[in-house]
Amino acid sequence: MLGNAMVEACPAEGDAPVPITPAGRPRSGQRSYPDRLDVGLLRTAGVCVLASVMAHVDVTVVSVAQRTFVADFGSTQAVVAWTMTGYMLALATVIPTAGWAADRFGTRRLFMGSVLAFTLGSLLCAVAPNILLLIIFRVVQGFGGGMLTPVSFAILAREAGPKRLGRVMAVVGIPMLLGPVGGPILGGWLIGAYGWRWIFLVNLPVGLSALVLAAIVFPRDRPAASENFDYMGLLLLSPGLATFLFGVSSSPARGTMADRHVLIPAITGLALIAAFVAHSWYRTEHPLIDMRLFQNRAVAQANMTMTVLSLGLFGSFLLLPSYLQQVLHQSPMQSGVHIIPQGLGAMLAMPIAGAMMDRRGPAKIVLVGIMLIAAGLGTFAFGVARQADYLPILPTGLAIMGMGMGCSMMPLSGAAVQTLAPHQIARGSTLISVNQQVGGSIGTALMSVLLTYQFNHSEIIATAKKVALTPESGAGRGAAVDPSSLPRQTNFAAQLLHDLSHAYAVVFVIATALVVSTLIPAAFLPKQQASHRRAPLLSA
């Protein structure tokens, strides 16, 4: 397991005192960690950030390019949406294998292989001659990108140790949160200046740089002894997650979750996932994802909190730029600029949150973060309901929401592994990555369905959509709707604005309620810092 790799890995610093037992004897085989964030650790964090930001920015950049794909390939929005869905399904398929692969091949080699796969996928996407090949190459990207987050986190957890984990996650989290904010700006500029292919070509120098730096900076870790791979677990979980998320992601196009094209794959996926849970719980050796980690109270509460929080948070992420573009008539680049307060709020809060987590444990700071997210999202919903201009309500809500993200997301990830033994960290980080992905995917689909439901119950919006789909409007080819093509009736534009704002406000309020409900599992997170107490360690 990863224990061999972690225990035998080259230390970043060798001058720290050797840990001793209560009887005063050094603990043989254990690694010592300095209290400060040394240069070696910061270099390792920098390489992890470089690769992770590349993958995170790519997601937001591709979302900005959806209309451009429709126009250039002469396709439909339903087909083009698979450039996002295919990537998501690839993530769901590969993330469960990250823990085993880290143990089997070593985190250093797995990280470099993941960066290489993502970079090659980017090159293939850039030269794709049609929409079908673009979707296929996005899946290749997803196979590489799916490994990056859990493997990067395992590397950082190994190099930082429990006493420095909160601070190093704060250092890493700032650029990772700012990256997606800059994605729409970068994407809008590249598409306008050079064309959509450059949103993929820009990944090549970044990916190659991360590959070279990883080879230089990362310490060599020894893969664990060969173990029996859990093929049955893989055959149950990966298709289960992919099938379930396929069904859920199909719901916005169907307008309801009650459609058979949604229910059949979703129920099939849930059945496969349930079978995997039973298989993993009773498999005595090397399960793909060790569900027995949930016997650790800190792991269970952190994963439950992350899943519920992702439901409300990631669904609202999808709708923020959509609202700014559709209702406030902003361009993709403008909407990206106007979401910057969210990133600035996270940047302000994250260093404080990391230091507090190291001193006091994750519970209090996560609770504060969730309350801030709810307050910020509620403020934004209030501005939307009032049909307010961007200033001053909307940026205020975004900034408060960003501060909450800075106080909650990284501490939750840290809480999921902070009480685990070294050989369990890769499996623990894989577990919370899977739950975050599943929660975010369900939340995104849920918010899209709710918004579609609100749109379908407005005659004004239905009329506007019919106009937008006519060839004369240009919207079917990815262009904006010509206001002169709207029906010439009294106050039609004002009524359309009212109905659009009401639809978005309802969805944002529901997202806020989901975030508030996260306070329940978060209240049971560990109240103490990890070095002061250790949860019972499970055999792996």
From Swiss-Prot:
The chain crosses the membrane at residues 45-65, 78-98, 117-137, 171-191, 198-218, 229-249, 262-282, 304-324, 337-357, 365-385, 390-410, 431-451, 505-525. Signal peptide: none annotated. Pfam families: MFS_1. Keywords: Cell membrane, Membrane, Transmembrane, Transmembrane helix, Transport. GO terms for molecular function: transmembrane transporter activity. GO terms for cellular component: extracellular region; plasma membrane. It is a multi-pass membrane protein. InterPro entries: EmrB-like (IPR004638), MFS (IPR011701), MFS_dom (IPR020846), MFS_trans_sf (IPR036259). The lineage of its organism: Bacteria, Bacillati, Actinomycetota, Actinomycetes, Mycobacteriales. GO terms for biological process: transmembrane transport. It is found in: Cell membrane. PANTHER family: BLR6921 PROTEIN, MAJOR FACILITATOR SUPERFAMILY MULTIDRUG TRANSPORTER MFSC. Its main location: membrane. Belongs to the major facilitator superfamily. EmrB family. This is Multidrug resistance protein B homolog.
